[in-house]
Amino acid sequence: MNIKISNANQPSWKVINVKSHIPEALKKLDELAHNLWWSWNTEAMQLFASLDGDLWKKVNKNPIDLLRSIDYDRLIELSKDGETIARMDKVYGDFRKYMDVKPDAKRASVAYFCMEYGLNHVLKIYSGGLGILAGDYLKEASDSNVDMVAVGFLYRYGYFTQSLSMDGQQIANYEAQDFDRLPIERVLDKDGYQVIVNVPYPNFMVHAALWVANVGRIKLYLLDTDNEMNSEFDRRITHSLYGGDWENRIKQEYLLGIGGMLALKQLGIKKDIYHCNEGHAALCNVQRLAEYVESGMTFDEALELVRASSLYTVHTPVPAGHDYFDEGLFNKYMNQFPARLGISWDEFMGLGRTNPDDKGEKFCMSTFLCKTCQEVNGVSWLHGRVSQQMFKDIWPGYLPNYTHPNHAERSHDEWFKIYNPHPEESHVGYVTNGVHFPTWCAKEWQAVYAKYLGKDYIYDQSNSKIWEKIYNVPDEVIWNTRVLLKNKLIDYIRARFRENWLRNQGDPSLVVSLLDKINPNALLIGFARRFATYKRAHLLFSDLDRLSKIVNNPDYPVQFLFAGKAHPADGAGQGLIKKIYDISQRPEFMGKILFLDNYDMQLARRLVSGVDIWMNTPTRPLEASGTSGEKALMNGVINLSVLDGWWYEGYREGAGWALTDRRTYENQEHQDKLDASTIYSMLEQEIIPLYYARNRKGYSENWVRTVKNSIACIAPQYTMKRQLDDYYDRFYNPEAARFKTLVAHDNQLAKDIASWKESVAQRWDNIRVVSSERSENLQNGALVSGKEFSVKHVIDEQGLDDAIGVDLVIMSGAEGNEEIYSVMPMNVVGREGNLYTFELTSSVDLAGSYKVAYRMYPKNKNLPNRQDFCYVRWFI
């Protein structure tokens, strides 16, 4: 038998790429789609939706995917449609007018480094608040027309997509991104080939392909190692955000800092200021130091220039947010740099240690940045104070206070004025985070604001006078806008639950029962954030009987929405999600407490505009900022929060609700129970009655008044416009001005400062107090309030020329809780050779028990702050 049942060889496939052919008349659409400006321009998004509404939803509102997927016949039809062409021309005209404005040359230019960017849900290169903040920042930089460039990663898988099993277990799904379907472009060289950045790791080379995301006027350059030039292990460097082990983490941070700087150098880009948004980008300063040294400068001279042009923003006081590397692992990747820098390995390691002499201490990226950046800042008033305390041991001899004044209603400027009563003790500052208004404000609210505040309100977002016009908006407009957005959210939730139930093959009768219990007329409270334990998502469930009475009141119904992801390695966070899910499935809570999976930017926009109350309950003071509440208030949503992060500054009586900023119990479990009871009481006695106090027109006048107060009194202070302006006023422009003086005349001042520091360091141990004289009352420690005392010290400066300063430092408070009462500078009143005479006459106004000591330090008018050269000697 010669005939076989089958006879076939394996196919050999050839990959071909079919690009969508966009008719010439519609070419402008492609340019619009490749600039993320569309993501915060309502008319642009409406334009894309009008091409094919069903397909627009199917491609998850991704214009690149839309243009690739739309039927060619439909494109031909649209190219001949006058209305479509007119709409496209209008949007494109607005876009070109926006793009063609030249950057503001009066402001410093900035290179911005961050591990993640939340620009739009279709570009999955973010995980949470840090990335969203960075994305908003680039958008506002574009809107404000500043000269900025950004560097990050193009992740193949990004952060995980979350789903829940039928029993409430978090499932982390990693879905590969198709880069050709994203609003990004390859960076091409002059020959039309994609630019490859060759990053020299020890003993091997990593080849990073370079992409660009156009964020309005700002270019975000993205490094991508997932290509055939790299080994399997190196391709993984840009696979996942915060994925892998510690070795992959250091490879990522090496690529971001060193590879990012090499990318900018290859593109010919130099900026005035280099801003490290979190510690992940710390190694950019290693590369910058190396380049200065290799240009002929000493390490100390190079450090002056790098420090003077660098800013480090810290985003968390939580230890897990600061990367520490074992010396062995750090040496594996960084051992070539000491020779390039002209220093020893121990000196290099010391830059990342709080105590450089502690050989057992790991290398901390945050510590390294504190030592190589002139300026360091937290992301809210309170977080700035916490950061001063967190980093104080890096600059021994200075005593920043952790205490803070009782909360009071103050303007943003007033908070800044009371920030640091003793600025000589710490240079660590703050800029309170804001949010990008066009991204997070629902189009329905934008229409209200444009009508009643004036169309130009968007260009002057931080002007409180403009926002006061909200009081002129009819109450019915405020209430109806809130109801409209809540109904849209409810419809979205119902669709999500149906889809998820079908995907999990759940009992259809259960989902029908659940959806029937969702009440669009109920007071709706939202809680959505990263599920770390300090966020205290469990707080509401401390007393289930009391909670059941709240949600099951037939006359005043209340519903709660929860959303958020826990890191795949965070078992406790995942346990919280399961606990909430399990409670939500109990009969008394079914449809009253809902957990929505896969919290991303798309869901976040719906939540912050659709709920009535935004709840935030972190363990104080671990919430650095917490911008979701800022997004909510711009949409007429009222905040209920712990006085922490931005809300410590933002809270105003009559414009939201706050838990006290004072801790009652040291035991955290007891404090949690007290805070939970407080929340229940506020809901029962204030919030719920206020919401349901309806007038004859069916709305609560006092609720609307609270919404208006929230918008008028708080919103203008928490825009990204205000945040960007603060960075320029407090950090970028002053640093750039100082840097300009340092590099003038072939870096002469930088060289002079480095030489002066070397001279002081050589003499420091020999500088001595020759004699001291004190008034009798000070000598005996028996001062009387209001009565003067005097002191005189003669100091041998060992040949230095008026380079020493002396403070009298007075401390108050019990042992372990001391605070600075006063820092009194002593004055130089005479000189004989190397001997300088310092005198002080002063008094203490308040009776009490104090400690006093004298502090000697080097002084130089060209230093930006005392921590820049932290030599201190105490004496009594």
Task: Report each predicted region and the residues it spans.
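Catalytic cores of carbohydrate-active enzymes across secretory and cytosolic contexts
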Residues: 1-876
